Design a protein with these regions (language model features):
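GT-A fold catalytic core of metal-dependent nucleotide-sugar glycosyltransferases
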Residues: 84-136, 155-156
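Conserved catalytic core of nucleotide-sugar-dependent glycosyltransferases
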Residues: 121-175
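Short, solvent-exposed loop/turn segments at secondary-structure junctions
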Residues: 13, 41-43, 111-112, 135-138, ...
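Low-complexity, glycine/alanine/valine/leucine- and proline-rich hydrophobic stretches
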Residues: 236-285
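Short, charged, surface-exposed secondary-structure boundary motifs
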Residues: 64-72, 138-144, 215
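A structural signal for short, well-ordered beta-strand segments and their strand-loop junctions
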Residues: 35-36, 105-106, 131, 203-207, ...
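Catalytic core and acceptor-binding pocket of nucleotide-sugar-dependent glycosyltransferases
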Residues: 161-245, 252
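N-terminal anchoring/stem segment of glycosyltransferases
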Residues: 1-75, 95-101, 288-342
Length: 342
């Protein structure tokens, strides 16, 4: 798998998730390398001290020195917007470093692999760019304004066609990359909409086992058979996107299925979420003496720009608190006691 290289980024607050991604790749894609853009010095120092095989950490300062155009956007963008701006530039950085790699694939830090990605790469034969649709349920169709495709998996073959797409994407994110919808633009993600018509050899990944997530899980039947999570009976789960998973109210870990009006079955709780939560807790326990990361929180959203956005944010916060209480009442949460999830 040495010709397949992955890259991601996260800070020390996301460290347990990033390491869970790494360990799942080690199990299911042995020999592949994971490059990590460390968004804080604490993150870099921890990863450097762990010295894990096939994990290549890089300081944010090193990346910015190599791409001053991206670094120049930092004062004009929120932390989250700046991280989004870095996505294609980080891919391009890794493509230039990994000249022998066949594919360089960007992964969001909150992905977790349950099976080998070989089935995905079989789809990509002859392709130079790989993108994956959100596959929103009908209940979430209004979210298409955020993009047809999800930036959680974006792959580029290390050839002129792949590099052309990533280079264009980087330039567009330098030009504009904000955490709100502006026409057909949204963060780093909206630009993916034009990939199929703009570039050659673009493959839209069809395997429904790739990027199962709260926003699309309601479309499928999820079962557990023969030690595998199966989607619609015949397709094994390759990787899940644990977007929105977070701690709250001290001892609880919440998911955001209710935000997407998505089901949360016993099989999903036991065979999808529980293994991931257990991995996070094990990682936090093992690296606790190095860095305390037990209170993992998502990156802050963009700064408030008007009263409407402020009020909308207040409404979201109230809604989320109500959802948390409902989840506690209906068994959708994990209670964490002494490092064990129940």
């Amino acid at each position: 798998m040495a010709n397949r290289v992955y890259c991601t980024y996260f800070d020390h607050r996301y460290l347990s998730r990033g390491l869970a991604l790494y360990h799942s790749l080690r199990r299911h894609a042995p020999g592949s390398r994971l490059w990590v853009l460390c968004l804080t010095d604490e993150c870099y120092r921890t990863l450097a001290s762990l010295d894990l095989p096939d994990l290549i950490p890089r300081r944010l300062a090193e990346f910015e020195a190599a791409d001053p155009e991206v670094a120049a956007t930092r004062p004009t963008r929120s932390a989250l917007e700046y991280y989004f701006t870095c996505s294609p530039a980080w891919m391009l950085f890794v493509l230039k470093c990994e000249l022998s790699a066949e594919w360089v694939t960007y992964l969001d830090g909150d992905l977790f692999f349950f099976e080998s990605p070989d089935a995905i790469f079989r789809e990509l034969e002859g392709s130079a760019v790989a993108i994956i649709p959100h596959r929103y349920t009908a209940k979430n169709s209004r979210r298409l304004r955020f993009g047809i495709y999800n930036v959680g998996w974006v792959g580029a073959r290390n050839d002129p066609d792949g590099i052309e797409a990533v280079t264009w994407w980087r330039a567009k994110c330098v030009e504009w990359c904000h955490d709100y919808v502006d026409g057909d633009r949204f963060a780093d993600q909206g630009y993916l909409n034009s990939f199929p018509s703009r570039f050659r050899r673009v493959k839209i990944i069809e395997n429904i086992g790739a990027n199962l997530a709260p926003w699309n899980i309601g479309k499928y039947r999820i079962d557990f058979r023969d030690d595998r999570v199966m989607i619609d009976t015949t397709c094994p789960l390759i990787f899940f996107h644990f977007q929105g998973l977070k701690r709250g109210l001290g001892w609880f870990i919440f998911n955001n299925h209710r935000v997407y009006r998505a089901p949360f079955s016993g099989d999903v709780r036991k065979h999808v979420y529980k293994p991931y939560v257990d991995e996070l807790l094990a990682i936090e326990s093992s690296i606790g003496p190095i860095l305390q990361v037990s209170d993992v929180k998502p990156h802050r959203r963009s700064a408030v720009i008007d009263l409407g956005q402020y009020l909308a944010g207040m409404a979201r916060g109230l809604r989320n608190r109500v959802f948390q209480l409902l989840d506690m009442m209906t068994g959708r949460v994990f209670l964490v006691l002494r490092g064990t999830a129940y």
